[in-house]
Swiss-Prot record:
The lineage of its organism: Bacteria, Bacillati, Mycoplasmatota, Mycoplasmoidales, Metamycoplasmataceae. It is found in: Cytoplasm. It comes from Mycoplasmopsis pulmonis (strain UAB CTIP). The keyword Flavoprotein does not apply. Coiled coil: none annotated. This is Cysteine--tRNA ligase. One of its GO terms (biological process) is cysteinyl-tRNA aminoacylation. Its cofactor is Zn(2+). Belongs to the class-I aminoacyl-tRNA synthetase family. Keywords: Aminoacyl-tRNA synthetase, ATP-binding, Cytoplasm, Ligase, Metal-binding, Nucleotide-binding, Protein biosynthesis, Zinc. Pfam families: DUF402 (PF04167), tRNA-synt_1e (PF01406). GO terms for molecular function: ATP binding; cysteine-tRNA ligase activity; metal ion binding. The gene is cysS.
Length: 596
């Protein structure tokens, strides 16, 4: 059958077939709401379903049906105020002809319930149909691999599991009056759906994390990257353990440094900040940081910052001066309690809004200037987390005072609660026996440093302790990476599957708890146990943890695996033939890649 690459009508049909070509179910009248390079997305309400037996019924609740292009699954999402229900079908890639989406169903399905329980179903049916329909090995391998991929999507909350993916579509449906229903059961559906969504954002079960972000006036160095790599590991560990997370990482795009760079270069502040924000996003991609949910910028939120300062003013915490507005720290009980005696000497009121004659000016109650640095983070936390207390507020150890102390003071003033349950002050990165700093000129740009080496260095260090970058430290990290690469290649070579058992979860829990020392101790125990016993279950545990750590080398090994598997098999073949000269040629290819 020849597939068409476009959709002709607003409403289409869907047909599901068995492997022998029998049509077993059809959906009539599904509405197309999106068709782009990645997905076709349908909206089902009052669509009619017909079974092979002749039985038919009408869809009685709204749902989305996502058909990723050239993938071996599709996703049905039942929209419910109490929480969406996912039903994922393992299938052939769909084709489109005669105004109909058509696919072959491969029996196994994955269900994800509103409270995030996950279940794999119809495995027995799949095993039965391997015999009845004669599924070839390629189909069986594809199905098992796709299940692993989908479980990984779920663990990382990516793709259609990401919090914004479905909610953005539902927002669009609501705006287009497509969530208005006559039945009593569905009355006020849109209102109830979004009320529950807001409640869920406030729900204590959400693991709430905020990390102070960079000032985008220059390229970031590895010292800047330490906090975000560490927090990404912690957040992904929480996701792996079943927690719903919200991770916010701000971008400071108003600052004296940006203004000075603008004056020197005669390039606008906006162009400078946009340039280095783009560069920062490239570095985040290189370091495989994917857990960040929101990255608010100061320039996009000036009005909100003004309202936030006004709310502090109404409560009597703001003092007007000739050159701006400051926060009265004397009104905050225990302000500076955690400070050293030396720091306490520096305690003073801090600017919420400062008048300025340089750079772009913004208006606060007739005063032209810009917001103070300490207010932006407080506003973002207050706004995005609905005035709730964070689980973790992270940043470099140098932000402890005054930045974090002043954030907390403002939050207490507005909300009568502390800004966070736990502070995470990540240690500094030292180079040439000094803190890595652009002003000292002793930086290693993040784009020039190997991201896997950096992650190994961080994992093998206490989160709050300083790290001294030396050649010896880098070489030690390379040794560990080479060890992990060999283990991971062997895992793939044996066609093993990832493990999500208590042994793996224990190690992931240590990452979530910021106990990197215990994590390394346990992982090395399993590596030693495997090297001694060569038991597949030990290798599976180790490789599952290595995969969780999300190294770049994993992607490369998986990408080249088919080619290197052939090289490995040829090498083994020559060994059996005792043709050691040719065997060594192929062995060297694998050694050069660090795979054996």
């Amino acid at each position: 059958m020849k597939s068409k690459t476009f959709l002709e009508k607003n409403f289409i049909n869907v047909q599901a077939y068995k492997y022998n070509g029998d049509l077993y179910r059809q959906w009539n009248g599904s509405k197309i709401i999106k068709n782009d390079s990645q997905n076709i997305i349908l909206y089902n309400f009052h669509s009619r379903i017909m079974e092979k037996s002749g039985k038919s019924w009408q869809v009685s609740e709204p749902s989305l049906w996502i058909f990723p292009k050239n993938e071996n699954y599709n996703v049905n999402v039942l929209l419910r105020p109490e929480g969406n229900y996912y039903y994922i079908n393992l299938t052939s890639p769909f084709i489109f002809e005669d105004n109909t989406i058509k696919y072959i169903d491969f029996d196994i399905d994955i269900k994800v319930y509103p409270k995030k329980e996950i279940e794999i179903v119809d495995i027995k049916e799949f095993q039965k149909n391997i015999k009845d329909y004669g599924y070839p090995p390629s189909v069986r391998k594809m199905v098992y691999k796709q299940v692993q991929n989908l479980l990984m999507f779920y663990e990382k909350q990516t793709s259609f599991f990401h919090r914004d993916f479905i909610d953005n579509i539902v927002n669009s449906l609501a705006k287009n009056k497509m969530l208005v229903f006559q039945s009593k059961k569905l009355s006020n559906f849109s209102q109830r759906y979004f009320e529950e969504l807001r409640k869920n954002t406030k729900n204590e079960k959400i693991f709430k994390v905020y990390l102070c972000g960079p000032t985008v006036y220059d390229e970031v160095h590895i010292g800047n990257m330490r906090s975000v790599v560490v927090v990404d590991l912690i957040v992904r560990a929480q996701k792996y353990l079943g927690k719903k997370t919200l991770f916010v990482h701000n971008i400071t795009d108003i600052d004296d440094k940006i203004i000075e760079r603008s004056i020197q270069s005669k390039i606008s502040e906006n162009k400078i900040s946009e340039k280095y924000f783009r560069e920062y996003k490239k570095v985040l991609k290189k370091y495989r940081i994917k857990s960040i949910d929101k990255m608010p910028k100061v320039t996009d939120n000036i009005d909100s910052i003004v309202k936030f300062i006004n709310s502090l003013d109404k409560k009597g915490y703001v003092i007007q001066k000739d050159d701006g507005f400051v926060f009265d720290v004397s009104k905050i009980k225990n302000y500076g309690k955690r400070l050293s005696r030396e720091d306490k000497k520096q305690v003073e009121n801090f600017y919420l809004w400062k008048s300025t004659t340089k750079g772009v000016q913004y208006n606060y109650n007739g005063f032209l200037g810009r917001p103070g640095w300490h207010s932006e983070c407080t506003l973002f936390i207050d706004d995005i987390f609905n005035s709730q207390t964070l689980d973790i507020h992270a940043g470099g150890i140098d932000l402890t005072f005054p930045h974090h102390e002043n954030e907390n003071a403002q939050y207490i003033a507005k909300n009568d609660v502390k800004i966070t349950k736990h502070w995470l002050h990540v240690g500094q990165v030292m180079f040439k026996n000094q803190k890595m700093s652009k002003s000292l000129g002793n930086v290693i740009l993040a784009k020039d440093f190997d991201e896997d080496i950096f992650k190994i260095i961080l994992i093998n260090s206490s989160v709050t302790a300083p790290i001294y970058i030396t050649n010896e430290l880098i070489e030690n990290a390379k040794v560990i990476i080479n060890k992990y690469k060999k283990l991971y290649f062997k895992f793939l070579n044996l066609s093993l599957s990832f493990n999500f058992d208590d042994n793996v979860r224990y190690m992931v829990r240590k990452i979530a708890d910021k106990d990197f020392s215990s994590f390394n101790l346990k992982l090395n125990e399993y590596i030693k146990a495997y090297n001694t016993s060569l038991e597949a279950d030990k290798l599976t545990i180790v490789s599952s943890v290595i995969h969780f750590l999300n190294f770049s080398f994993i992607e490369q090994i998986e990408k080249d695996f088919r080619k290197n598997k052939k090289i490995y098999d040829i090498w083994q073949g020559f060994l059996k033939q005792k043709n050691y000269e040719k065997a060594d040629m192929f062995r060297k290819i694998l050694i050069d890649q660090g795979l054996i």
